[in-house]
Curated annotation (Swiss-Prot):
Family: Belongs to the SNW family.
Subcellular localization(s) per the UniProt record: Nucleus
Originating species: Candida glabrata (strain ATCC 2001 / BCRC 20586 / JCM 3761 / NBRC 0622 / NRRL Y-65 / CBS 138)
UniProt-recorded name of the protein: Pre-mRNA-processing protein 45
InterPro entries: SKI-int_prot_SKIP (IPR017862), SKI-int_prot_SKIP_SNW-dom (IPR004015)
Keyword hit for Nucleus: yes
Single GO BP term: generation of catalytic spliceosome for second transesterification step
Amino acid sequence: MSFSSLLPPPEHSPPDDVNSREVEIITKEHDFIVNALTKKEAVHSSNNNIGSFVGSQVANFNDVIPLRQKDFYGVQAPLPTTQEIELCKVRTQEVVNRLLHKFTDKGKAGYQKDTRKITTGSRIITIESKRQDPLQPSRQKNTSSKIVLPEDDETDTPILHATDDAKSKRLTKEERAKWNIPAAVSSWKNPMGYTVGLKHRAAHGKKTGNVGSINNKVSDIVAALDETDQEIREGIQQENELKRKQLKEEERIKEEKLRAIAERSKIQTQSSAVKKRGSRFEGGRHQNKKIKKEEPPIKSAAERLKELAYAQGREVSEKVILGAAKATTTGTGANVHYDSRLFSKGANAAAKRSEEQVYDNPLFVQQEIDSIYRVNAKSIDEANSVSASRYGPIQFTKAHSLDDKSTAKDEEET
């Protein structure tokens, strides 16, 4: 017996005799298991299962024992058979298919023949409804929440009178003139934006019949308004003139103050300049005296050479400094050639620029480094021209020593 077998059948499933019998058998088995778990006597009783623990009025000691500690005499819940499992599977499959069939049903496909003129021949078009996802939300808007007001039937119906009817009374010209409103005086309509004075505004007494008459009080009011307007304008002009005069006076006072300040500053600068000149002369004299005292005495050339040699870490004799020392001659007084690089190395031996500097000069000059891999067109042209100017066989000459050269020179001189 499975858990799905205990569930009730689907709501919309048709009644079946086989299903009802199976349900009865399952319920009986369920009652038997419940009685066996709750009461010992139910195991030895017949399959009718008359009487239950709920209906009994007398309580036993076994009723107090917990279910986990009771001995059920080997009673086991029967497992469902393969036939029951298959029946449950078929029923659930039918219900699921019936629910999904509403959404996934294609509907009957419609066929329509194309009647257009086609050279290749006629064709048939199939029309099918698109499949919808059953889990997709509905696209229709919920219009039930909208409030629709009922139509108002009680509208104001206009009352129309027939003009041809004899009962209808027509208005005369006098009545129309009473209801007429002049365009200049109308407060409802003034599209051109005209302004009307009080004199002309008071002359619209068509209702009273006094068309051309103007009240004297109106003219008095107009005159009073004009007078007050003129007085106000004159007062404003006078106030503006007073303000202008005050501003001019303030500007004049400011200019005078600035001029006085400028004159004072000029006088102060002139007096300070005169004082500074005198102090400068006196200060310059004292400063020159201090400089002369602080300056070291003038040293001779010999003393300076001694100091220079001492700074370079060399010992130079006084004869060398004074130029009295003479170069020693070797042998018979022949000309001895010295390499000038020895002197430069000796002079720069103690004057190293840094501890990392091992050699006096770099390996290559910077210009030679830059032109290592650069082709020099001038040198190539010179080499070509020299090679082209050569002609004849190569002649070798015998090398001469220094002694041979000196004897040859002596012979030429003699």
